Structures are given as structure tokens and as C-alpha cells.
Amino acid sequence: MNNIRKTHPLMKIVNSSFIDLPTPSNISSWWNFGSLLGICLIAQILTGLFLAMHYTSDTMTAFSSVTHICRDVNYGWLIRYLHANGASMFFICLFLHVGRGLYYGSYMFLETWNIGVLLLFAVMATAFMGYVLPWGQMSFWGATVITNLLSAIPYIGTNLVEWIWGGFSVDKATLTRFFAFHFILPFIVAALAGVHLLFLHETGSNNPSGLNSDTDKIPFHPYYTIKDILGALIMITTLSSLVLFSPDMLGDPDNYIPANPLNTPPHIKPEWYFLFAYAILRSIPNKLGGVLALVLSIAILTIIPLLHTAKQRSMMFRPMSQCLFWILVADLFTLTWIGGQPVEHPFVIIGQLASVIYFMLILLIMPITSMIENQLLKW
């Protein structure tokens, strides 16, 4: 009798994706983050679903409904904090996943990489709209400031902003549509993640050496299933510790004040995972220029395959490129720190320098260094 795992139409797909999938024998723990992102997405959809059962997307009751969830719903506080901090875990895994792709040259799988960038944009949009829903001070003013950036678009800007707002300011219509989009986008993200995997399985996984691994493959199960379970346990332990011991560590205290259009908070800032992009936005004095830099700070990932001048795919055997990669990581930490600081000296100039270094490293310094390394190979 034929094995149902290999003959059943649905089981066949699962089998070829998670069981019999030929996988390079030398992939390290940096390859765990794809599965961790899948777990994060499922956790966010489930906790979000239970929150949506009790949440009301009305300006008069949104803040109260979140309070009601935390105080009156059975384990509502747990669901709410798992969802809020789960978003932070999601972005930690995302940044590490993208960093892994940059370091080991995974961007050479063009379709997989570009869908990944699209996924990053979609997750960022989802997270931004989710932050607006509790309708605290930072929710309201964050929504006002970020949506207002679209008014920098020539000619159609003002009309576009009012169309998104559904009025002349961030109000009930805005909150309702943000809730609708925040609910639907994770399912679109899940579908895109499926396409992301589809394209990845066309080529097979990359590996730390960057070399073709067709001669040395092992089945995904049990070797990498057990490895992914270990990664998942570490992530779940970290998330649980965060949720149960300091659930508000990554949030903003201002969001415990109900939204008030008549009172602006002293420092408007987004969640920590957007601070690097926010710092780049603020470092340019011109509004349109800032918006372009903000979009380009993420969109630049799409042109990285074009900037790959090295003869080797991975940075594993390229020490100069490795140094530059870690300088880029340090620069992103600097930008994240600056994004959370007030707009005053010396933070402004540090932010501007860090922004210039960010774009210079990716567009100029790293490609030139790769070319120098190519010459060094001949020695």
C-alpha cells in the first residue's frame, strides 16, 4: 500500500515542504527564523482574533474596550500583552531573518527576496495600524503624524490624506478602517508567506558557505524539525518572560492616556521597531525628502542583488565585508536610539550622520569593498 503521506493531494504538499524536503546539511541556527516567523504570525492571528471579539472600533469606546479586556475578560490581560509583545518578537525575528539574508547572500534568490521585502512592508503596515487601535495618546498622534507624511506627495497629497482619514482629521472613520485593515492584512501576509516558501522551495535553501549544496542534502524531518522546535521553545520562553514580568517595557506610557486631540504629547514616537526609519525621516529637514528617505530605507533592500559585486555569494570568507556588515548593524542600533530621542543637539547631527552612513554603506562602500576583495583573491 502506498504511503498516504506521499499520495494524498494535501499531505503531499506538507510532505514536500516540511518532511522530505531536501535541506543543506550545514545550515546554522540563523536559518531558524523563518519557522519562528511562521509561529509568530499564527500566534498574532490567534491572539488578535480573541482580542477582536471584545474590542470596539469606535473613538468613544475603543480605549475603554481595551481596559475592559485587561480587567474583565478571562485572561484578557494575557491575550493583550501576548499580542502587543508578540509584535516585538515578530520584528526581532524579522530583522534577524533579513540580516541573515544579507550576510549569507540569500538575496540572490530574487523572487524569494523580493516577496520577502513585500512581506516586510505588509507587516510594518499591519503593526502601524495595530498601534492606533488602543486609541491612547501615542496611538492618535502617531496616526496623525505618520498619515500626514503623505501630504508631502505633490499635487494629490492633501486629498490623499483626507481620503485615508475619511474626514479632515484622524477620527472615528480612520479608526474603523484601520481596524478593518489590521484584521485583513495578517491573512494577506500569511498568503504571501506561502508564496515566499513556494519560491524558496523552487531553488532550495542557501547555506552558510554560499556554495551549491546539491551533493550534501538531508531530509528536513527529523533533523530540522527538532532544531526548529528548540528555537521555538527559546522564543516562547523569552516572550513569556517578557509578558509575565515586564509587559510594558517596550510600550509607551503615554498610550495609557486616552487620545486627546487638544493635547500633544511632548515627544511623538512610534514603537521601537520603527525608530530606525523614523530617525532617517527626521534627519532630513525637507518633508518630501524625509518621506522618500523613509520609504527608501526599506525599499533599498530590493536593489541589494544588483549591488552584489563579489565573486563569492556569502560573507563567510570575506572579512572586509563582514566588518562593514557589523558596522551597518551598529549604525541601525544608533538610528534606533536616535529615533527615540528629542529633536535637539547633539541628537539631530548624530541622526543625520547615521542616516548618511546607512545609505553610503549599502550603495557605495560595500559594493566597492567587494570589488577590492575580488582583486585580493588573485594574490
Curated annotation (Swiss-Prot):
Cofactor note: Binds 2 heme b groups non-covalently.
Any single Pfam family the record assigns to this protein: Cytochrom_B_C
Binding of heme b b566, residues: H97, H196
Segments crossing the lipid bilayer: 33-53, 77-98, 113-133, 178-198, 226-246, 288-308, 320-340, 347-367
Residues annotated for heme b b562 binding in this entry: H83, H182
Job description of the protein: Component of the ubiquinol-cytochrome c reductase complex (complex III or cytochrome b-c1 complex) that is part of the mitochondrial respiratory chain. The b-c1 complex mediates electron transfer from ubiquinol to cytochrome c. Contributes to the generation of a proton gradient across the mitochondrial membrane that is then used for ATP synthesis.
Cofactor(s) required, per the database record: heme b
Entry's localization field: Mitochondrion inner membrane
Subunit structure: The cytochrome bc1 complex contains 11 subunits: 3 respiratory subunits (MT-CYB, CYC1 and UQCRFS1), 2 core proteins (UQCRC1 and UQCRC2) and 6 low-molecular weight proteins (UQCRH/QCR6, UQCRB/QCR7, UQCRQ/QCR8, UQCR10/QCR9, UQCR11/QCR10 and a cleavage product of UQCRFS1). This cytochrome bc1 complex then forms a dimer.
Name of the molecule in the record: Cytochrome b
Binding-site residues for a ubiquinone, renumbered to this chain: H201
The keyword Translocase is assigned to this record: no
Keyword list, A-Z: Electron transport, Heme, Iron, Membrane, Metal-binding, Mitochondrion, Mitochondrion inner membrane, Respiratory chain, Transmembrane, Transmembrane helix, Transport, Ubiquinone
InterPro entries: Cyt_b/b6_C, Cyt_b/b6_C_sf, Cyt_b/b6_N, Cytb/b6-like_sf, Cytochrome_b, Cytochrome_b_C_euk/bac, Cytochrome_b_N_euk/bac, Di-haem_cyt_TM
PANTHER family, per database record: CYTOCHROME B
Organism: Crocidura horsfieldii (Horsfield's shrew)
GO MF annotations, alphabetized: metal ion binding; ubiquinol-cytochrome-c reductase activity
GO cellular component, one term: respiratory chain complex III
Topology relative to the membrane: Multi-pass membrane protein
Membership in a protein family: Belongs to the cytochrome b family.
Gene3D superfamilies, A to Z: Cytochrome Bc1 Complex, Chain C (1.20.810.10)
GO biological process: mitochondrial electron transport, ubiquinol to cytochrome c
More details: Heme 1 (or BL or b562) is low-potential and absorbs at about 562 nm, and heme 2 (or BH or b566) is high-potential and absorbs at about 566 nm.
